[in-house]
């Protein structure tokens, strides 16, 4: 269990309240597939993801980005039980999809870049980023729990 201060909880929930999952999710997943091209192998059912232009125009990438952000919303709503919130998803990514857990860190980084670009230094202050990174680290850790 992660120990959250009241200030961290407030920063995470406030930032989350400003995030448009339909904007940030597709941007973050698109960025992941472009910046870390080896992750494309996990998305073969999405059709063409072989070029930057194909990724940018792929509606399945955009939809899955929204799905990912919906999963993050579950963590925001369950800050005190992130590990159990992600147990089933961790098992699926480990046993069925065989996703390298380092990819979760890469996606978290892409989400942070997109959030920082969207909100800038006025809203995404160092204090907010500190809480946000702690939150994403907890999510990444929870997603990696079921790996052998």
Curated annotation (Swiss-Prot):
Disulphide linkage map: none
Task: Point out the gene that encodes the protein.
Answer: hbb2
The Gene Ontology terms for molecular function here are: haptoglobin binding; heme binding; metal ion binding; organic acid binding; oxygen binding; oxygen carrier activity; peroxidase activity
Positions in coiled-coil regions = none
Organism of origin: Seriola quinqueradiata (Five-ray yellowtail)
**PANTHER family, sorted:** HEMOGLOBIN FAMILY MEMBER, HEMOGLOBIN SUBUNIT BETA-1-RELATED
State the name under which the record lists this protein: Hemoglobin subunit beta-B
Give residues annotated as binding heme b.
Answer: 64, 93
Which GO cellular component terms, listed alphabetically, does the Swiss-Prot or TrEMBL entry include?
A: blood microparticle; haptoglobin-hemoglobin complex; hemoglobin complex
């Amino acid at each position: 269990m992660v120990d959250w201060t009241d200030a961290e909880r407030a920063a995470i929930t406030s930032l989350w309240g400003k995030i448009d999952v339909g904007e940030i999710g597709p941007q973050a997943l698109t960025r992941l597939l472009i910046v870390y091209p080896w992750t494309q192998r996990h998305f073969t059912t999405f059709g063409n993801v072989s070029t930057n232009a194909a990724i940018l125009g792929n509606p399945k990438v955009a939809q899955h980005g929204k799905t990912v952000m919906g999963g993050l919303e579950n963590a925001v709503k369950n800050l005190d039980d992130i590990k159990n919130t992600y147990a089933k998803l961790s098992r699926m990514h480990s046993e069925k999809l065989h996703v390298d857990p380092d990819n979760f860190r890469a996606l978290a980084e892409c989400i942070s870049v997109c959030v920082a670009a969207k909100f800038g230094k006025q809203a995404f202050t160092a204090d907010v980023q500190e809480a946000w990174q702690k939150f994403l680290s907890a999510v990444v850790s929870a997603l990696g729990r079921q790996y052998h």
